[in-house]
Amino acid sequence: MSAPLTLALSKGRIFEETVPLLAAAGVTVAEDPETSRKLILPTTDPNLRVIVVRATDVPTYVEYGAADFGVAGKDVLLEHGGGGLYQPIDLNIARCRMSVAVPAGFDYANAVRQGARLRVATKYVETAREHFAAKGVHVDLIKLYGSMELAPLVGLADAIVDLVSSGGTLKANNLVEVEEIMPISSRLVVNQAALKLKRAALKPFLDAFERASLGSGA
């Protein structure tokens, strides 16, 4: 009997919104990662198991073949670079946007017009660098791993680049969204070698995910 396929998922919104896609393929994950201590979760399909990893690590597990396929946000994939990955499907889940935000009262447009050099805090350094370079905005990028909203409040940065969903966290911290960089959603990523060697085993899942994603994007 061949080894089961391995699907890499991260906890939280991506996991929660992938569950219905798995259900469309007739598969249920046996345990909830929010309550289970296990990092390898069986499913109702003996040919599929789920590993629970950090969102930023999903592309790495898939690239190196530790997982055959996974679900990762466009934001994570842009920072990773996408090497060694096949990205067949935009799943239309975990949708939000990547934006620039500043403290309320800070005249961002004028600062840009004046050619000011801005300090920008973000975990998305590569994407932010490309965005500001394309607009001719001079920035010093400060890499942080969380609590972006704090950086402008304590004088660490003039602005942040972060993911925005409802905007509630920005508002609660007296920040305003001044520029949308791009819409973000999560994508299915597949190890390129697995796609060749395990195509028959992967195909039912890829087909089910594609059908379900078309429905969720409607």
Swiss-Prot record:
GO cellular component assignments: cytoplasm
Enzyme Commission number(s): 2.4.2.17
Molecular-function GO terms, alphabetical: ATP binding; ATP phosphoribosyltransferase activity
Compartments, record wording: Cytoplasm
Catalytic activity reported: 1-(5-phospho-beta-D-ribosyl)-ATP + diphosphate = 5-phospho-alpha-D-ribose 1-diphosphate + ATP
InterPro entries assigned: ATP_PRibTrfase_cat, ATP_PRibTrfase_CS, ATP_PRibTrfase_HisG, ATP_PRibTrfase_HisG_short
Pathway connected to this protein: Amino-acid biosynthesis; L-histidine biosynthesis; L-histidine from 5-phospho-alpha-D-ribose 1-diphosphate: step 1/9
A GO BP entry: L-histidine biosynthetic process
Main enzyme class: transferase
UniProt keyword terms in alphabetical order: Amino-acid biosynthesis, ATP-binding, Cytoplasm, Glycosyltransferase, Histidine biosynthesis, Nucleotide-binding, Transferase
Pfam family, one: HisG
Segment forming the signal sequence: none
Family of the protein in this entry: Belongs to the ATP phosphoribosyltransferase family. Short subfamily.
Domain notes from UniProt: Lacks the C-terminal regulatory region which is replaced by HisZ.
PANTHER family, A to Z: ATP PHOSPHORIBOSYLTRANSFERASE, ATP PHOSPHORIBOSYLTRANSFERASE ATP-PRTASE
Role this protein plays: Catalyzes the condensation of ATP and 5-phosphoribose 1-diphosphate to form N'-(5'-phosphoribosyl)-ATP (PR-ATP). Has a crucial role in the pathway because the rate of histidine biosynthesis seems to be controlled primarily by regulation of HisG enzymatic activity.
NCBIfam families: hisG (TIGR00070)
Subunit structure as annotated in this protein's UniProt entry: Heteromultimer composed of HisG and HisZ subunits.
Protein name, entry field: ATP phosphoribosyltransferase
UniProt source species: Burkholderia mallei (strain ATCC 23344)
